[in-house]
Design a protein with these regions (language model features):
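Acidic, low-complexity terminal tails and accessory targeting/binding regions
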Residues: 2-10, 84, 90-102, 165-219
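Glycine-rich phosphate-binding loop signature in dinucleotide/nucleotide-binding domains
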Residues: 53-55, 144-149
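Phosphate-coordination/substrate-recognition cap region in phosphate-metabolizing enzymes
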Residues: 48-119
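Generic beta-sheet signal
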Residues: 13, 149-157
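Short beta-strand scaffold positions
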Residues: 61-62, 133, 154-155
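An N-terminal RHG(E/S)-centered segment typical of histidine phosphatases
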Residues: 1-56, 72, 77, 203-219
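Internal catalytic-core helix/loop-beta-alpha segment
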Residues: 120-147
Length: 219
C-alpha cells in the first residue's frame, strides 16, 4: 500500500499505534511490559517503511514496552533517536485488571469509576479527568517543536482516540459520545498511522486538525 503524503506548512504529527501483542489478540488488559507478538514485530517493520516516506524530523514513543519495540525499527529506518515520553502512554489501568477481558465485570466497574472521575493510581487506575490533563500536557510538548516539524508519535489506541476527541475540546464527552468513542477504539488497527496537523499561525481558536484518519500499513 502506498501512503498518501500530504505536504503542508503546518507541523505534521503522525500517530502510529504500536504493533500487535498477545493481549490485543485476546482482548485483555495489559501490563506495561507486554512485548510485541511475531505479527506485531512485522507490523512495526511495515510501519517503519511507511514512516520513512514521510521524512520525519522527530520520533517520540510512549514509555511502554510495546510502543518502544514498535519505535525501534522506525528509528533504524529514519536514523532518528527515540524520545521516550510517558505522557503519550496508554490509559493507566489498575493492576487487578491485568489479564482480564475488556468486557469482564471488573472492567465494567473500572470504566464507571474512570468516567465519573474516581481515581486511585494504585487501586482504580487513571480517571477520565486525569488523562484529559495528560493530553493537554502532550499537546504542549508537541507545540514546542519547530513549526514545520514532522513528528512521529508511537502510542496506543485509547490514547490516540482520546487525543483526537479532545483536539479542540477540553471538557468531557457525554456518555452517549463515549459509546461512539468505544467503537472507534476497535477500528484503529495495530501498526496504523493517523495524521494530525498543528498550525501555530491559524486564526481559528483551535489550531489543531485531523488531516487523515487511520491508514493501515501493509501486513
Amino acid at each position: 500500500m502506498i501512503m498518501l503524503i500530504l505536504r503542508t506548512t503546518n507541523m505534521d504529527i503522525y500517530f502510529v499505534r504500536h504493533g500487535q501483542t498477545m493481549g490485543n489478540l485476546a482482548k485483555r488488559h495489559q501490563a506495561e511490559h507486554t512485548p510485541l507478538s511475531s505479527l506485531g514485530r512485522e507490523q512495526a517493520s511495515n510501519a517503519a517503511k511507511e514512516v520513512a516516506q514521510l521524512n520525519p524530523t522527530h520520533l517520540i514513543s510512549s514509555n511502554l514496552v510495546r510502543a518502544i519495540e514498535t519505535a525501534r525499527p522506525i528509528a533504524e529506518t529514519t536514523n532518528l533517536d527515540i524520545t521516550i515520553e510517558q505522557n503519550f502512554a496508554e490509559l493507566f489501568r489498575p493492576k487487578y485488571l491485568h489479564g482480564k477481558h475488556h468486557l469482564s465485570p471488573q472492567s465494567i466497574f473500572y470504566y464507571a469509576l474512570w468516567f465519573f472521575g474516581i481515581e486511585n493510581r494504585k487501586l482504580a487506575g487513571e480517571s477520565y479527568e486525569h488523562i484529559r490533563q495528560r493530553i493537554t500536557v502532550a499537546k504542549n510538548i508537541l507545540q514546542r517543536y519547530p513549526k514545520n516539524a514532522t513528528i512521529v508519535v508511537v502510542s496506543h489506541s485509547v490514547f490516540i482516540n482520546l487525543f483526537l476527541a479532545h483536539l479542540c475540546r477540553a471538557r468531557a464527552l457525554s456518555v452517549f459520545s463515549l459509546l461512539g468513542f468505544v467503537s472507534k477504539i476497535v477500528r484503529i488497527p495495530n501498526g496504523s498511522i493517523t495524521h494530525v496537523a498543528y498550525d501555530s499561525d491559524a486564526k481559528e481558536a483551535c489550531k489543531w486538525s485531523v488531516v487523515r484518519k487511520t491508514t493501515e500499513t501493509n501486513f
